[in-house]
Each structure stands twice: as structure tokens, then as C-alpha cells.
């Protein structure tokens, strides 16, 4: 996901983009949960001696990122929000089957909530609702590799556990709102307007929670870095540089 932006970002920041446990090249955890993922990434950051940091929030990475941010808010230099949900009011109709599963975790509801865990559903992460001319810029190798990884031992179970566990993240939305209200971290939004999974209205909730948030809406889908990596990297570089300068000004004052 970050392959195209890491070279640019490394000009001004030390970039750490690990695969979450059970994703990519990372091993599967025996006990799968977003807090467990947060602890694993926190241990990695401590091992690397990382202090203050910018945190990228996207989809399943948002619960992990907030776990890290809320454990040590003084370390957060800024948030970069890219198609991530943190507000109860912004769940669209596409979440109905998942919410039904959270309320009534029957086998039937689980099957409906996880029906997208197929090759076609994996492809939809990239292409669903995306205009054809934009979708044409994404090579099929991307979702083919994702599907290969999902089919490895333990990976499908990881996906199912996270879908169920996302309800516990949703239950933390009030605490997240309190964190944002108290700390008001410098924030940059990069949002693909054609996302089939996260409602565009969520952008308003973010900006209401963070009135000084810088927001940019792209003609892209859920995985906007696949099609708009260059402008996204430029915006992130500018955001980090300005945040660094403001931090220096506060120190001098």
C-alpha cells in the first residue's frame, strides 16, 4: 500500500510501515484482536526506539493507530487520516449486515458479514465504485497477491476475527472523541470520494472533531494510494514539514 510513497516520505521522516499480524509477510497471532495488534506495533516502535511519531489511520489500521495514540498521546506529532471511520453516525447501509452480526452473532449473520472474503471481494477493495478510467490504473497483480496471502493458513480466520472485533472498536468511539477533543492533534485528511465501504459523510465528522484539520478529497476509491500516490505523498510531505516547523516554534517560545 505504501510502496509508492515511502521513497518521498523518507526525505523528511523515518517511515515504518509494517504489515499487521496476519497480513502481508507478518505472522498470524494466536489471539487476534485490534488491541493485540496495537500492542504488537507498540512493541515494534519501542524496539526501534521510536519516540514522537505521525500515525497513518486507514480502515483496519485505524483501531490499531488509535490504540497507540491514546496510550501515549504526548508522542503523537500528527494524524494522517485516509478513509477511516471513527464516528457512529457515519455508517452507511453497506454496514447493515456487519452490524446485524455484531448485535446477533449467529452463524447465519457471520456468513453474511464475511461474504466478501472471496477473490471478488478482495478485488472490490481496489475497484468497487471506482470510475473505470481510475480503476484502469490499478494492476490486477495487486488484488491477486492480496488473495494469495488471505488464502494462507490462519489468514482467513484473522479476517473473520477482525470483522467481529471491529464492534469493540466502535464501542470506543466516545473515548476517541474525548481524545481528539482534548489533544487536537495536527491532522491531514486524504480521502477517496468513491470509497464503497466508508461513507463520504464521514469526512464531515472528522472535520467537526478536528476543526483545524486539513482535508483533501480525491477522485479515487478505498485504496487511493494505488492511484494517487504522487499528490498524496506531496501533501503528506508538506504537512510533516509544517508540523515540524510549528513544533520548533513552540520549543523556541
Positions of PLM-derived features:
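Flexible "cap/lid" subdomain of the alpha/beta-hydrolase fold that forms the substrate-access gate
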Residues: 16, 23-56, 60-216, 238
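Conserved HGGG/HGGXW glycine-rich cap/lid loop of the alpha/beta-hydrolase fold
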Residues: 1-25
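Generic recognition of short, well-ordered alpha-helical segments
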Residues: 1-4, 29, 201, 205, ...
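Catalytic active-site module of serine/aspartate enzymes centered on a nucleophile-bearing elbow/loop
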Residues: 212-253
Amino acid at each position: 500500500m505504501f510502496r509508492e510513497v515511502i521513497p518521498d516520505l523518507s526525505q523528511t521522516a523515518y517511515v515504518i510501515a509494517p504489515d499487521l499480524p496476519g497480513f502481508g509477510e507478518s505472522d498470524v497471532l494466536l489471539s487476534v484482536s485490534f488491541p493485540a495488534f496495537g500492542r504488537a506495533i507498540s512493541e515494534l516502535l519501542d524496539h526501534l526506539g521510536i519516540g514522537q511519531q505521525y500515525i497513518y489511520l486507514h480502515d483496519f489500521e485505524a483501531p490499531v493507530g488509535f490504540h497507540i495514540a491514546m496510550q501515549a498521546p504526548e508522542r503523537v506529532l500528527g494524524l494522517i487520516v485516509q478513509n477511516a471511520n471513527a464516528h457512529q453516525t457515519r455508517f452507511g447501509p453497506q454496514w447493515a449486515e456487519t452490524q446485524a452480526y455484531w448485535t446477533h452473532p449467529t452463524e447465519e449473520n457471520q456468513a453474511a458479514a464475511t461474504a466478501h472474503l472471496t477473490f471478488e471481494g478482495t478485488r472490490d477493495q481496489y475497484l468497487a465504485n471506482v470510475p473505470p478510467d481510475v480503476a484502469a490504473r490499478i494492476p490486477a497483480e495487486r488484488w491477486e497477491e492480496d488473495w494469495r496471502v488471505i488464502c494462507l493458513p490462519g489468514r482467513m480466520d484473522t479476517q473473520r476475527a477482525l470483522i467481529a472485533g471491529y464492534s469493540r472498536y466502535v464501542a470506543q468511539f466516545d473515548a476517541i472523541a474525548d481524545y481528539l477533543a482534548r489533544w487536537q492533534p495536527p491532522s491531514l485528511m486524504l480521502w477517496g470520494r468513491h470509497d464503497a465501504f466508508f461513507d463520504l459523510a464521514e469526512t464531515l465528522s472528522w472535520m467537526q472533531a478536528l476543526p483545524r484539520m486539513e482535508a483533501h478529497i480525491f477522485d479515487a476509491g478505498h485504496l487511493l494510494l494505488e492511484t494517487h500516490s504522487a499528490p498524496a505523498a506531496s501533501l503528506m510531505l508538506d504537512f510533516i514539514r509544517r508540523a515540524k516547523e510549528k513544533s520548533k516554534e513552540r520549543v523556541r517560545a
